[in-house]
């Protein structure tokens, strides 16, 4: 039986056919003034087999959201997937997949050097007690260890 086409791109992705970790273009939108928005699926864990624990995911979200902007001024957003298997990276007017991989690599290397999770306090975060720097570093390290595989989505 064929699955009906959904409005959300990732709901149309056959999650049983991907091989994490990977980085893929999930969507492209052209604005009325010609701006290009590209959303990347940055998958850390194999769907339906593994997931990131919340404190590690939450800390990696904070770290990458802050650090990635040191490497790229076209980043719009870095947000976690509800399934806890990856993140979405949204960029504006930048259409170079190879450079995105390089920026992600540099960012993850910087995560490994971090001494604290940015904005992990009650004034700047909605769940400040839910952080682990070591957990975030472990996720970044595992992702970097598979750097050669990031462009192999498997679909």
UniProtKB/Swiss-Prot annotation:
Required cofactors, per record? Fe cation
Instruction: Give the record's subunit note.
Output: Homodimer.
Q: What is its EC number?
A: 4.4.1.21
SS bond list: none
Say which family it is in: Belongs to the LuxS family.
Q: Does the record bear Lyase in its keywords?
A: yes
Q: Which InterPro entries match?
A: LuxS_sf, Metalloenz_LuxS/M16, S-ribosylhomocysteinase
Encoded by which gene? luxS
Please name the NCBIfam families in this protein's record: PRK02260.1-4 (NF002604)
Protein name per UniProt: S-ribosylhomocysteine lyase
Q: Name one GO molecular function term.
A: iron ion binding
Which residues does the annotation say bind Fe cation? 58, 62, 125
Gene source species:
Helicobacter pylori (strain G27)
A Gene Ontology annotation in the biological process aspect, one of them, is:
quorum sensing
- Keywords for this protein: Autoinducer synthesis, Iron, Lyase, Metal-binding, Quorum sensing
Briefly state the protein's biological role: Involved in the synthesis of autoinducer 2 (AI-2) which is secreted by bacteria and is used to communicate both the cell density and the metabolic potential of the environment. The regulation of gene expression in response to changes in cell density is called quorum sensing. Catalyzes the transformation of S-ribosylhomocysteine (RHC) to homocysteine (HC) and 4,5-dihydroxy-2,3-pentadione (DPD).
Keyword flag Transmembrane: no
An example Pfam family from this entry, by short name, is: LuxS
Co-factor binding details: Binds 1 Fe cation per subunit.
What catalytic activity is recorded?
Answer: S-(5-deoxy-D-ribos-5-yl)-L-homocysteine = (S)-4,5-dihydroxypentane-2,3-dione + L-homocysteine
């Amino acid at each position: 039986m064929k699955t009906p086409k959904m409005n959300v791109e990732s709901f149309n992705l056959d999650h049983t056919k991907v091989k994490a970790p990977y980085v893929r273009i999930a969507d492209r939108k052209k604005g009325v003034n010609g701006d290009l928005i590209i959303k990347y699926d940055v998958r850390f864990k194999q769907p339906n087999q593994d997931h990131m624990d919340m404190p590690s995911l939450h800390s990696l979200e904070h770290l990458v959201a802050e650090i990635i902007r040191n490497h790229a001024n076209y980043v719009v957003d870095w947000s976690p997937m509800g399934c806890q298997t990856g993140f979405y990276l949204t960029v504006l007017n930048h259409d170079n997949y190879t450079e995105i991989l390089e920026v992600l690599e540099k960012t993850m290397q910087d995560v490994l050097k971090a001494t604290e999770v940015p904005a992990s306090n009650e004034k700047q975060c909605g769940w400040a007690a839910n952080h682990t720097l070591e957990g975030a570093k472990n996720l970044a390290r595992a992702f970097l260890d598979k750097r050669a595989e990031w462009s192999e989505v498997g679909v």
